[in-house]
Amino acid sequence: MGNNRPMPTLVLSCEHAVCSVPEWYRERFKDSQDVLTSHLGWDPGALNLGQAFAMKFHTPLTHGEITRLLIDLDLAPDNPRRFSDFVAGLSGDQLARMQERHLGAYLETLRQRITSGIHVSPPVVHLSVHTFSPESGLVPPATDIVILSQGGRPNEVLLSGAWVAALRNAAPDLAI
């Protein structure tokens, strides 16, 4: 008998994959390399982890191509915090172009992959890969893995709970 449900489509993303700065914005970071290369500028290791998941599950990885200190791809297009202080002084047109070129293109790629997944093999599971540093204060210092879910989404909470249970069973020494 068994479970006849189709395998869900996995959509992988990594918003804070790099700390790259396009040539035309480099002057803004000339005295801020430490900030740019810190966890404030990107999620070190997240791109490698996302690529490993993509290879393991034979699915593409959608990832950011610029530092979150220019525009944070993890924030909504209307969130005023999506732009950092490093873009202060740019005109509205410049900010709109940056948003369209980076955030808009990124979100459109994700939408296309999710829509395609819904048509091919629903349901779709979207996994966004991040890393946290102890300095961020976002996780307890001795934490190895964090699985986040949005409380208002019951299926997401169930999947996250099952994943945590499976990880604890497979690797009881990890702090999850």
Residue ranges and their predicted role:
Residues 1-176:
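N-terminal catalytic or cofactor-binding beta/alpha core of small enzyme domains
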